[in-house]
Amino acid sequence: MKEYRTITQVAGPLVFVEKTEPVGYQELVNLVLADGSEKRGQVLDTSDDIVVVQVFETTTGIGKDTGVRFTGETIKMPVGKDMLGRILSGAGKPKDGGPDIVPEKRLEITGAAINPWARGSPRQFIQTGISTIDLTNTLVRGQKLPIFSGSGLPHNEIALQIARQAKVPGSDEQFAVVFAAMGITKEEENQFMAEFERTGALEHAVVFLNLADDPAVERIITPRLALTTAEYLAFELDYHVLVILTDMTNYCEALRQIGAAREEVPGRRGYPGYMYTDLASLYERAGIIKGKKGSVTQLSILTMPGDDITHPIPDLSGYITEGQIVVNRDLHRKGIYPPINVLPSLSRLMNLGIGKGFTREDHKKVSDQLYAGYAEGVDLRGLVAIVGKDALSERDRGFLEFAEMFENRFVRQGKDEDRTIDESLDLGWDLLKDIPEEQLVRIDRELIQKYHPKYRKKAE
């Protein structure tokens, strides 16, 4: 392998090398320092006379006397069934004290977009055990659904709870979770590792942890390693895989950092103009392929800077993905966990995975009625602030009380509370029983007579 000493400039995580031979985009590079140690990098850009290399570690010690070796290969992820139960670094190295992974295959981490013609329609309900997701914003197998959160909100706890509890009820098919955390603190890393080991969820999971003090370049690689692992488990070993990515905001900040080092012309709020395309290359790797038994479902968590849902990161994510789950600061202040606000939340594929044969025949109608009742109660809170509660009619006071009950009984649940979909539906009916039947306008009469607590007691 030829070694060149043609480095002209080092800027942040980037090394600029005078071109001496044809090199490929994303080709791996070994950098040999004066003391004989090696660092690894990847070709980020190439022109007629200059190659830009992004280094996976710090660039400390790299100078004009550093040797550069182009390997002719791209980054490949060693994959195998033995990965289940392992905790890896953001670069795919063992972090749990275990041995290196014995690969059954080595796959390129860039993956390939699923051919639209080959995509199957998402149909199967995934139970997370969280009522506000399962009943009102259902996650469907093969869907990509982001969780919009904010700084200081318990999105990590929600992510861990979903990773522990997610399952396809009534199915004996193989299910796995791939969990990738980007830009987390050492404290969060310890929390994630301890929680996975405490609950036994690690048995059917592969965990990737990238720390805040790890290089920004590694943060770009981490979700691609996770998705490559998920695709292997899903499409070659027939697993149904749930991929949880947190925090995509840290990923986008790494994109911005590298773009600034390359002196690119910035887009909105300093983020690269290609951020939409880059995010799509990750999100679109979720799905189902016709003729394959497995599936890849994505839950990506991002913190909205300043709780601004119009910020480029949540804004662009919303265009690519199929809905959003919104974590709310007001609910968090009330001490409600998980503080998920169902009103701005949406699952665009919900109707494909609910109803008779999937969950229960009353699922859609109960969800609509709960949503309508809660929305009316929240609107009335604004009116009460102006005219006072005494000015409300008896009907309005009923909906005001319903909104309080909805938050405190339906939204609120324990961090280890795993509700089945039947339990969530029965709880929904229990809340609706206090609303006069003539006001349950979104539920068919036959469903009321079958599932309403008043009629169920008579039947018993």
Curated annotation (Swiss-Prot):
Component of the A-type ATP synthase that produces ATP from ADP in the presence of a proton gradient across the membrane. The B chain is a regulatory subunit. Has multiple subunits with at least A(3), B(3), C, D, E, F, H, I and proteolipid K(x). SUPFAM superfamilies: C-terminal domain of alpha and beta subunits of F1 ATP synthase (SSF47917), N-terminal domain of alpha and beta subunits of F1 ATP synthase (SSF50615), P-loop containing nucleoside triphosphate hydrolases (SSF52540). GO terms for molecular function: ATP binding; proton-transporting ATP synthase activity, rotational mechanism. GO terms for cellular component: plasma membrane. It is a peripheral membrane protein. Keywords: ATP synthesis, Cell membrane, Hydrogen ion transport, Ion transport, Membrane, Transport. Belongs to the ATPase alpha/beta chains family. This is A-type ATP synthase subunit B 1. GO terms for biological process: proton motive force-driven plasma membrane ATP synthesis. Its main location: membrane. Gene3D superfamilies: 3.40.50.12240.
